[in-house]
């Protein structure tokens, strides 16, 4: 008689725990991605979603999660994976095609030598990211048109969105971030970021669980002096010392109150006048309370004892 040992019985307790935690993480990522897609109407029936696959952990996770969601979505949509081979030295051209064929996913590899352009134009020691991203974006828009893709899905996550916000805040003087969904400047393409609600730490753990064949970026990954890395370290330090702070900042990006900022294009401060009608959602904590007719009348502040009058003057200074 042959004894058959099931795969589950063959696992060690540590392996079983890792598998359990990995499956729990996968469910959480699917839930957060589904929520972002629904909140911003990222994917609709009949869409052809072009998933930009770089070979990094984020884009691998994005493709993996979207393929999983595609199987149980209440409507049909297509997925095609696209990789831009920028001819970086040491880039292994066989890894992604082999991975995608094994998954049975339609894919397209676009080969463009942007590496030579960037290294020729940008002086040594300077950051290459800006030019590289512009070149890459233009190529991907063209490929999307050629493939008939209706949505371009990028693997940016919560930390990328936060980092971009702080970069614009610190170095650009703008309260500007990285939106979960946008239309390209030429008005022809819709870009979506389904991982907008997912923290990078979860994607790191997911890549380890799934054992994605990660391809390092030798061009920008080696530029350790990037401001984005500095901002990333700041966010990590916050998460370590002040749990919840970075999430509060992230949540604030979707809870903007234009009347309490200073942008005259967002709110009409020039035409702002009292209406005599209380704002139900307003802050009335500092509104003056009308005095009772039988206890005080006009000029009550001047009739008050000296100490009390001084206190009122002090309050006016404090809250001015």
Swiss-Prot record:
Name where it's found.
Cytoplasm
For this protein, the record's InterPro entries field holds: Rossmann-like_a/b/a_fold, TilS/TtcA_N, tRNA_Cyd_32_2_STrfase
Return the CDD domains for the record: TtcA-like (cd24138)
Q: Report the co-factor binding details.
A: Binds 1 [4Fe-4S] cluster per subunit. The cluster is chelated by three Cys residues, the fourth Fe has a free coordination site that may bind a sulfur atom transferred from the persulfide of IscS.
**Which reaction(s) does its UniProt entry say it catalyses?**
cytidine(32) in tRNA + S-sulfanyl-L-cysteinyl-[cysteine desulfurase] + AH2 + ATP = 2-thiocytidine(32) in tRNA + L-cysteinyl-[cysteine desulfurase] + A + AMP + diphosphate + H(+)
From its record, what is one biological process in GO terms? tRNA thio-modification
EC numbers on record:
2.8.1.-
Gene Ontology terms for molecular function: 4 iron, 4 sulfur cluster binding; ATP binding; magnesium ion binding; sulfurtransferase activity; tRNA binding
Identify the cofactor(s).
Mg(2+); [4Fe-4S] cluster
Renumbered to this chain, motif PP-loop motif spans: 54-59
What further fact does the record state?
A: The thiolation reaction likely consists of two steps: a first activation step by ATP to form an adenylated intermediate of the target base of tRNA, and a second nucleophilic substitution step of the sulfur (S) atom supplied by the hydrosulfide attached to the Fe-S cluster.
Mind telling me what this protein is named?
tRNA-cytidine(32) 2-sulfurtransferase
What is the scientific name of the source organism? Bordetella parapertussis (strain 12822 / ATCC BAA-587 / NCTC 13253)
């Amino acid at each position: 008689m042959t004894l058959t040992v099931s795969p589950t019985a063959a696992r060690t307790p540590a392996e079983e725990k890792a598998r359990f935690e990995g499956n729990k993480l996968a469910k959480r990522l699917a839930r957060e991605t589904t929520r972002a897609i629904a909140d911003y109407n990222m994917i609709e029936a009949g869409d052809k979603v072009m998933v930009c696959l770089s070979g990094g952990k984020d884009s691998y996770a994005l493709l993996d999660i979207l393929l999983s969601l595609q199987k149980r979505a209440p409507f049909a949509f297509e997925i095609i994976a696209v990789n831009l081979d920028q001819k970086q030295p040491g880039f292994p051209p066989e890894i992604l095609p082999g991975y995608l064929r094994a998954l049975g996913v339609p894919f397209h590899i676009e080969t463009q030598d942007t590496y030579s352009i960037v290294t020729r134009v940008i002086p040594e020691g300077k950051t290459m990211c800006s030019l590289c991203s512009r070149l890459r974006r233009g190529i991907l828009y063209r490929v999307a048109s050629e493939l008939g893709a209706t949505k371009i899905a990028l693997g940016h996550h919560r930390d990328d969105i936060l980092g971009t916000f702080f970069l614009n805040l610190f170095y650009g003087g703008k309260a500007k971030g990285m939106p979960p969904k946008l239309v390209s400047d030429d008005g022809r393409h819709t870009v979506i970021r389904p991982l907008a609600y997912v923290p990078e730490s979860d994607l790191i753990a997911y890549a380890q669980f799934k054992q994605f064949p990660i391809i390092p970026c030798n061009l920008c990954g080696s530029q350790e002096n990037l401001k984005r890395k500095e901002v990333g370290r700041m966010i990590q330090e916050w998460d370590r010392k002040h749990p919840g702070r970075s999430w509060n900042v992230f949540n604030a990006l979707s809870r903007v109150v234009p009347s309490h900022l200073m942008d005259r294009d967002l709110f009409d401060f020039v035409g702002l006048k009292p209406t005599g009608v209380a704002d139900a959602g307003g802050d009335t904590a500092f509104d003056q309370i009308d005095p009772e007719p039988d206890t005080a009348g006009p000029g009550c502040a001047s009739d008050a004892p000296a100490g009390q009058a001084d206190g009122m003057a002090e309050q006016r200074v404090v809250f001015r």
